[in-house]
Amino acid sequence: MALPISLINELKSTVGDQWVIIEEKAVERYLYDETAYGVRPQPVRDIVVVKPGSTEEVSEVLKLANKYKAKVYIRGGGTGLVGGAIPTKPGIVLSLERMDKVHVDSENMVAEAEAGATLGKLIEEAEKHNLMFPAHPGDEGAFIGGLIACNAGGSRAVKTGVMRNYVLGLEVVLPTGEVLKLGAKTIKNNFGYNLAHLFVGSEGVLGVVTKAYLRLYPKWSYTATIVVPFDSRVKAFKTAKKLLFSGLIPLALEYFDRRVIEASAKHLGLQWPIMEGDYFLMVILAEALEDVLFLELEYVDKAAREEGSLEPFATQRTDEQKTLLKIRSEIFTALKKDTFDILDTTVPLGSVDKFIEAVMDIERKHGVWLPVYGHVGDGNIHIHVLNYQGYTREQLIGVSEEIYEAALKLGGVITGEHGIGYIRRKYVRRLLGDVWVETMRKLKGILDPNKVLNPDKVIPEE
């Protein structure tokens, strides 16, 4: 163990003996996240796991880390896809799992959630008060702190935005141990610089989010899901554009093809219920008034048919909607074992069709399958580069970079919701420039003078 025994003893005095884990097998589960194996960094095993139970304990742990110049890696639910939680140097894994309280202030439609609370728990607690947290950025086992740190998005970002849009206030422990309390329960707050949003999307390099005030909404009374099949991608994208520019704002607008969605259904032991078509749009609608929902359903059906769709499948039944969404949501899991890397490219709305056609050109060039699906409603498209037989690691990275270039040529970016983490850091200087890098280094230097917090992430090496 590279960490001094005196540090370990002081950590035990701070959080309690049972919350400091040094046994190798127990530490193992804290060394990885969901990053695809082909691009995942190799973790170090010289790690101690510390589980604080309060903001005050987080503060004391960080003060000790500075005293001993020990590296600290923040651990949420382990659902990240870019290696952001993987320890790459000896140090402390700071797991926030004990800090999982959620309090709903129903009168003000605000949730006060600790960083270790899961997305699923937040949704469940809100529903007890006939309220909802509309965002659904993927895995419900993800921790609130991690979702904020990564500014997570997901399929429902079309109607209600990404995590940043919900954050009213934060409690943050700076790398040196000082505690910042930012924002309030109010919708509007123009008192001083909005430092809270400096930490949203900061990926754990500037501070540790320990608590958040999150905006909730009245629960939508009526929902419907309509899956529209097409015999060509062109017709699907024409319909998507038509819907987006009509003024209709769906809760979600998703694209996928038959091969991808049937792989997910098979993985779940289910059957995809739509027999026609090879390309699909899935439109999820949610409204307070049933009459409005019916008008929207009619419009989606009409607009799709005008663009040459096949027979749409619409349902208001809760069980059927959940099944459709479950199959869509498990695409990543179904493909995971064969995946070298999952890309998170995002392009302007009007260029989604051009981008996917460019990806299909790359697929044909290499004679491989590039599974494509995603949030067509906000331009965020996921592509899996698989472990193709006969391809070296360098060749697989080359395929990924061809896809990145296709997105960049259309004015897009290489990540829309997963973040930079460890695995995308090598592209930062080229894509964001020297001034961005130097500005971030200066900011990091002010907040984290001893460079203890989440090293090897986001900011390129000097």
Question: Whereabouts are the PLM-identified features?
Answer:
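C-terminal substrate-recognition/cap domain of FAD-linked oxidoreductases
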Residues: 22-33, 218, 229, 237-402, ...
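N-terminal flexible segment immediately upstream of the FAD-binding catalytic core
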Residues: 1-63, 80-109, 260-270, 318-342, ...
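FAD-binding subdomain of flavoenzyme oxidoreductases
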Residues: 101-105, 109-254, 453
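N-terminal accessory segments
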Residues: 1-38, 67-70, 303-320, 409-414, ...
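Short, ordered loop/turn segments at secondary-structure junctions
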Residues: 76-79, 99, 138, 255-258, ...
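Activity-critical C-terminal alpha-helical subdomain
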Residues: 178, 425-462
